[in-house]
């Protein structure tokens, strides 16, 4: 099995791209197949090297690797060879209308209540009419066979039957000699033996045309799966919608696996479970579970998954990131992971565990904190120190529950809520504990 993800490097990856890439990746990895990364950069005016690098970096950040990659701009000679073959065999034909003439035809069709389908007038030009266009470079269309329905078994939509009379003969090559999406995509799928194509439902008419192109080239037709489109606030998600790029999600400080856990299940009947690695998503993936209904995207739903991902990560999962913060103690991660919503929240806990932390004590609690300081156990501070300390305090005071724990937490962390204090004490050590308690009662 071979599938491909084919972004255009004319901008950053957005959520629609991410979902398509992820589903392609999970699908082929579950079948032990190959994942190709193809850059559709035939639009040389808008394609940029910067975006190619950013797309590669974003996929790596999202834990999606690829087995091979290539750029369509490196294959223009191959496209030209196939173009000449199709032209010779009568599958392509030249057209001479200007953009203004085509737009006029489109408006007249709509005004007459007809679908704006190309009238194939270029097919019926006499030699005399062609001579009038002498000196004007043609563009080329693929001649669709309108005599039979185009059928395929879609892995999401089931049996699909498409009437070719409902679409225009697609433009294959522009006046300037550059290629549109259609033909290069077909040639690449043929040459790289792509067996499965997964993409959005907005490509269904493209699929119908490309099946005929593959037939014209006597090539094997791959399996197709067309995903429903993503919507947000009743608007189709696109590159132009603010807040929808991978870069935007990184600014939200979303974890890659929160994003992946969400997009692997959104649009299915399955619950969205958090997975801290890709293997769990691979094992639970089922392409037939995806619905044909439009799929609502809400970044707030990913935000809710983010803390769950962090809470379930082990020290080994984050040790490289912690190392950048000069933290090498698994006990620290065990202490904070259940109380952060985004990874950068760790910085607050680093401060709390350092000598920079300023204790807080209420006036009414000063005597109690003095007592607690005197009751603190002797010897090395370890995991059981907290329970021993609290037991000692209870023997000397009638404080219980919140009245006992809240003043200690404020004095030791400056916060009204947070992780277990039993885990904090070994991290800050006896000297710092005594300093904080002493500071609290002397201010």
Curated annotation (Swiss-Prot):
Pfam families xref list: Anticodon_2, tRNA-synt_1c
InterPro entries: aa-tRNA-synth_I_cd-bd (IPR045462), aa-tRNA-synth_I_codon-bd_sub2 (IPR020751), aa-tRNA-synth_I_CS (IPR001412), aa_tRNA-synth_I_cd-bd_sf (IPR008925), Glu-tRNA-ligase_bac/mito (IPR004527), Glu/Gln-tRNA-synth (IPR000924), Glu/Gln-tRNA-synth_Ib_cat-dom (IPR020058), GluQ/Sye (IPR049940)
Motif placement: 'KMSKS' region: 236-240
Chain positions of motif 'HIGH' region: 7-17
Residue sites binding ATP per the record: 239
GO molecular function: ATP binding; glutamate-tRNA ligase activity; tRNA binding
Enzyme Commission number(s) from the entry: 6.1.1.17
One example of a Gene Ontology biological process annotation: glutamyl-tRNA aminoacylation
Subcellular location(s) of the protein: Cytoplasm
Known catalytic reactions: tRNA(Glu) + L-glutamate + ATP = L-glutamyl-tRNA(Glu) + AMP + diphosphate
Matching PROSITE patterns: AA_TRNA_LIGASE_I
Key words of the record: Aminoacyl-tRNA synthetase, ATP-binding, Cytoplasm, Ligase, Nucleotide-binding, Protein biosynthesis
Group of enzyme by EC: ligase
GO cellular component terms listed in the entry, alphabetical order: cytoplasm
Complex formation: Monomer.
Free-text function comment from the UniProt entry: Catalyzes the attachment of glutamate to tRNA(Glu) in a two-step reaction: glutamate is first activated by ATP to form Glu-AMP and then transferred to the acceptor end of tRNA(Glu).
Entry similarity comment: Belongs to the class-I aminoacyl-tRNA synthetase family. Glutamate--tRNA ligase type 1 subfamily.
Record's protein name: Glutamate--tRNA ligase 2
UniProt organism field: Ehrlichia canis (strain Jake)
